[in-house]
Structure formats: structure tokens, C-alpha cells
Amino acid sequence: MPRSTGAKLWSTLNKTATRNARRIQRELNRNITKPMTEAFVRNAVKQSAAITAATKRALSGVVSPAEPPRSRGSGRWEEGSWGAGPLAPRRYRIFVPAGANGRRRAPMLVLLHGCGQDTASFAAVTRAAAVAREAGWVVLLPEQSSQANAQRCWNWFKPAGQGAVEAGLLMALIEQACRMHPVAANRVSVLGLSAGGAMALTLGLRYPVRFAAVGSHSGAVPWSATNAAQATRAMRGQRGPDAQAVHALRLGLAGRRPPPLLLMHGDADAMVDFSNATAAAALWMHLQPEGAHPLAVVPARRVQRGMRRAVDVFDWTEGKAPYLRLVRVEGLGHAWSGGAGGHAFSDPAGPDGLKLALRFFLAVGA
């Protein structure tokens, strides 16, 4: 069986890896790569059928446009646009829960949609308003422009050019939202699906001090591609992050840890291979600062509630708090776990992805 992308990443970075990185890699192989590989071998025939079925489910339903989101309870939706220039402004929608005001500022979650989606469809898939209302969070949903990408994918695979411009534009929009709405600026997290997940990780590494936590659902590992062809290979698990880019990221972190990280990914994802999740975990571990207190490895646990899909949860903790969490969803294709029915890239049978994310973000202090 070929090595995982995570293992390839460490092989590529071997010459520049520190002793700390090598120790963490051994932990990664022992606690994620090896048990997962053994599990995949035991379930090879079952997984092949599951991938086919999951892909059909992910592509069924409505992609976009969807009906504009409406608040069916307290709180309100607002919409607008931000930015100018050759890449065109970006539309956005923002949900503000009741009770959030200048004296009672709320944490904010930035949700980045995947290819082919828009803010309305992604709000519907994730049930953003209902979950945010219950949790008391502001939710900001930026929308990619079809002028910037014909499929409305965030350009995570162009890190030195258009992708960097988009990351800067998104960061400016986030800061504007913090100024214009009752947001606790030190409690901003970002989470995305697919291309949005890769862009969320990109934002977390470009602007580490601005995010309390970051998350990717079914996203590619960032800095693994510089064009669309390379992006396709990365999504298949055939490319890892560029060693020079990773070295630059380490320098940019200047001795800081990257923000706490949540990774959610289905093991039946035929569009973005699950190995991207292990590669992203390995990247985060490699970027731990020299001399930092080592992360503690928590034994993997399996969770299943009722008839929902089972998940395997892998945690690394900093002190008593989780720092990195990888959630493998059994039988999930390229779709939002626990999403609303009737939409593409949404699997109602999985555990609620947005609730899982908010639980993690709250646990790390976001």
C-alpha cells in the first residue's frame, strides 16, 4: 500500500526537519498513520463500495444558487460586498445573534464555502443560523467571485499570487466585520469546506495571531500546489507541501505555535483524498517551535451516536486543552458531515459538522 501523503511530507522535509519534528512524526505514524492504514486494509472492499455510494450522494441535490437565508428565530442576517480592483469585490452574508451588542461582544466564525457553492447554499447546508443562534456566535460567510474563479473555488493553490491577494482580501473583510459588528476580535475562528478548507488553513498560517482557531472540512493540504494541475494531484494525495514554503512559514511564525487546528474528513472522499488530512496534521506538527513543550497524544477514540456515521477522533493536547484534533468520518464522501438534505456536497447521515467545530473551538478558548 503506498505511503500516506503525511509520510511523504516528512520524507520531503527530512533534510530540514528538527529533532522535535522527527519526534512528532514518530508519534504521527504510531498514532494515526499506522492504525488508519491497518484499518483501511481490513476494510478495503467495503471502502471501495462506500466511496462510489458517497460520491453519488455528494453530487445529488442542489448546488447553488439557493434561496437567501432567513432567520427563523432571533438574530438577523445582513449582506453586503467588500473590496475593489481587478479581482472584483466579494459579496458576503453575516448572521448576528440576538443579544450581541457593544457591551456583550460575541465570538465570530468565518465560514468559507467550497467550489460551486455560494453563501446562501453553504448557509443552508451547514444550518449556520440555527447553530450560531444556539451558540451565540456571529457567523460571517464570504462569497468567492466567479470572475476570480469560474467555479467559485477559493484560489488556495496560488499561494504566491492570486491566492495571497484573496487571503489579504478575506482578512480585510474579517477585520471590517469586527469593526462594524459586535464581535470579540480576539475570538475569531475560520472553517471551510474543500477549497474553503484549504483557504482557511492558508489564512491561519498567514495571519496566525488573528485567529483563535482554524478548521478544514474535506480540504486539501495548503502550500502543496501552485497551479490547477498540481492542485488536482494534491487533492488525490500525490503532492505534499513545498519544503521551501514550509521553511518560510516557520520563519513567519517567529517561534509561535500555529493556531489550534481542527480537521474533519470522510474516509470515502473520492475528490479530496483523506491523506490530505493527515498531511495537514503533519504540517502543523512540523511547524511547532523549537523547544516548545511537546504535545501530548490522547488515545484515539471511536464515537457513534444513534444511526449517525461513526467517527474516529485523534487528539493532541497542549496542557489540558486540545490543540489539534483530527476527525475521520466513516463512509463520508466529499460532503459536509450532518448537512441539510436536498443539497449537493451535504451528507445528512454524518454527525453535525458545525456543532463539532464549535465544540472544539470553545474547548481551545475561541
Q: Predicted segments — roles?
A:
Residues 165, 169, 276, 352, ...:
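Charged catalytic carboxylate motif
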Residues 2-16, 34, 88-90, 100, ...:
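Serine-hydrolase catalytic machinery in alpha/beta-hydrolase-like enzymes
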